[in-house]
Amino acid sequence: MPAKIVLFLTAFIMAPWANSEPLGLPPLPVPVDNPQTPEKIALGAKLFNDRRFSTTGEIACAHCHAPEKAFTDLKTVSEGINGLTGTRNAPTVINAAYFKSQFWDGREPSLERQSTQPLLNPVEMALPNHDPVLKIARTDPDYQKAFRAVFGKSGEAVTMVEVSRAIAAFERTLIAGDSPFDRYYFGGETGALTPAQVRGFALFLNEGRCVSCHTVEQDHALFTDHRFHNIGVGINQIQDQVPGLATAFLEAKARGANVDKAVLGDKKTSELGRFAVTSLVDELGAFKTPTLRNVAVTA
């Protein structure tokens, strides 16, 4: 995509817990069973940055989703425990609160569900189970105090439900809006964009048809349709192997194979895309439309 199009999509705002969203964003969806509170957000931030939640004590969520790198790692594929690499790019956490599904193949529906998987993946944080996380959460004095204050729980009553809810609450504060584009399109500031950027936006809407997938609504723009598309990248290189790969994967899945571990552990399996979740042939090689917010620093 030409640079003149993307320049105005890059404003980054780390929003504190608040009752209003930056210009250009819809109301923040917050689960009824996990309301935002400042104390919960602070606990989630601590958990997000805790490197003890890995087999070597070196990898935290923030390792692949670094604040100074727009909550990604700026690598083609992420590097986890002992330098092991996965098969997919680390998506930014910014605005993930608005996404209707998590991971590139949408295998989890919420931030709460998503947050527990990297802990157990052999190429990410590589814990054998969640027990090491819970041991720390239940015995660390600071965590004991925080979980008691936020959830009214301590000891064995603290589970991964509380851990995941705190992490998700923190992640819901990582939002980006109020960019020059937002001020131009939603705020009516005609001078917020340069003439070149205005021409780029016209191309984005019309000849380029970028907006077909990177949608702009009347009152907000997340620049994604939340859908899954096969644009031929990756899977076309192994087209003749796809039938065998798909069949083998379905058989393994029927035997109880873990989708998260399978797609991050094998590059060819990873190329199956959304099919690995739904088993629908039409979704072979399909991946979630990425947001264009902050694309200048995350691409």
Regions found by a protein language model. Give the residues of each.
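Sec-dependent signal peptide recognition
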Residues: P2-F8
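Short capping loops/turns at secondary-structure boundaries
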Residues: W104, A126, I136, D140, ...
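N-terminal signal peptide c-region/cleavage motif recognized by signal peptidases
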Residues: I13-A18
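Second-shell loop/turn segments in exported
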Residues: V30-D33, D50, N121-V123, H130-L134, ...
